[in-house]
């Protein structure tokens, strides 16, 4: 039975989500831009733009946590007779006859209609220009002539942009302009009732400082049935210092005029929009699945891949939840983002890996965050997150498996704290150093020291913070801290196995054997000190007491170590892995996924850190953290339980929640970081959508483990793990210049196991399809049984 549509619907053919009401539970946003010029836009045209770095190159202003929400933005004011309105319903809030917002791939179209006048604005950033376009279409659908005034509005920020020129231009004769917010709004007014719009007359104000804006007034006459179009261009031009001025005190606008010339006509704008849409069609073409399941198709083919691109661009920097002023790109975050992005634009993934490695210090520690503009580590947060170095190995291995590009290991990548070290340091050196760093920092049980935290930033076992305002992530004595992480031990085993594969290919057999031994040693340590009888312990605190154990009064079991234990291959042979997953279902399962821990913490404990400062059921304290749910999904497929893997995927999948939007609140087309758990007073509410590690890991879980097509060093592995009722599916996968058309059939209604595989009609043993000449089209038939 189709889902009830509360606020909109998926248009899969157009690759859009169509919002039919402006009053969504929270602003439902989209992103415009693919690389350098980026922006956020909501379904009511709220949002902001920046160049590369939301902190250091913010271009337009946005206010967080204001009432009403989602101000300011990219506004169009329409004055038609006695009515003033916005196509996006805000900020004037005049009730419209019709409203639609179409969020697409790098494009948002906001359309409103009132009294026979229809105004539609298409917002996008061209693929090859550092500018955003507002392409406005005005149509008179009435039987009368119309004389209207149209006002544009954007509010500039310009922080840290001393040598930049930002311009807001149009291709239409204007009736006036304003660049002063005070002049535009007037005294005691807000965005919903600006003086200039109320009086239908721009003041031609010039802002010399304080609150600069960009606004144009355009007068327009329309006959019945007539449509007119105009295009606003908001661009970023950065002049070299020596070319800043054309003459004393006059900015050199040569590059600005060159940019504007590319958008003079509707034909030029249309060509740029078509080029952008073609870019996205090509970007998503590397993996397409046909299956009798709408949630799989829309997430795997469109929205999850798109979210991975957005998350790769921004890490966790700028969203409706992240202000963009305090965080750059995360080391752990960005390495994980690569896992879901590498097949889309592998050359950008390569550059990102080298950039990340170059923020590592010579002792193996990694800056937890770095600024994309400077490519330097962010000292505000610093180092000391024990899992960070290992993610570099995971992302590098994924890149090589996808591309076969072994030259990346020889790429120069210096240490941030040793200037000039890039001359004699390679990426492979960083991978070895990452392994050594974890091995060198072990505690009394032989497990890796947790330092400030591991993947769970809020599990601060060496912090002991009792001072208001003190950061859990940067305070505490990590040098003398003795707390250990079982999860990092499991991640080490996983990373060590990846290193073994890489080194065996490089014919560095002695070192490969050594890493295999270290992986096995750590596996034994986890089984000895990290097993609690039914599940894996989470950690040991500063006093060497277990965290995530039956002996604890709260927080007896954590989700992270259950998933990673299986992914690392620990306890599979003796049933411990299966027991860990069964325990997860028994103690952590919720209707929206699995909660992070149980029982939830109900009081603050300084020896456990920030996790106990959250109310029960929220964030790291027993919410459904969707990110780590994906690890359990993958773990279930490794043990052959496709029904459970799919059940858990459905519970966290946003596409399944549109009919619950008044509870879920976040967008139904992108994954959220967290959903409030059953211990909270408001279970089922999502937070922190878009920019989350859930994006990449959910795509990996669905496409590589449930559908089962994943890159290996020597080809494509076809190893689905699906619910028994699935009869089969078709996948088109582009891999190293070859197109693989894969048909999977499940005649015996099993969950896992390849009974027979035909490659170009010929039987092939195993489940790995080998490499073919670039340009080839390969037909693969897989029979499960």
Per-segment meaning from a language model:
Residues 329-334, 338-349, 353-451, 485-493, ...:
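Aromatic-rich carbohydrate-recognition surfaces in CAZymes
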Residues 246-264, 271, 299, 345-358, ...:
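Extended, well-ordered alpha-helical scaffold segments
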Residues 128-131, 137-149, 153, 223-229, ...:
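Beta-rich accessory regions
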Residues 151-153, 367-369, 491-611, 650, ...:
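Catalytic cores of carbohydrate-active enzymes
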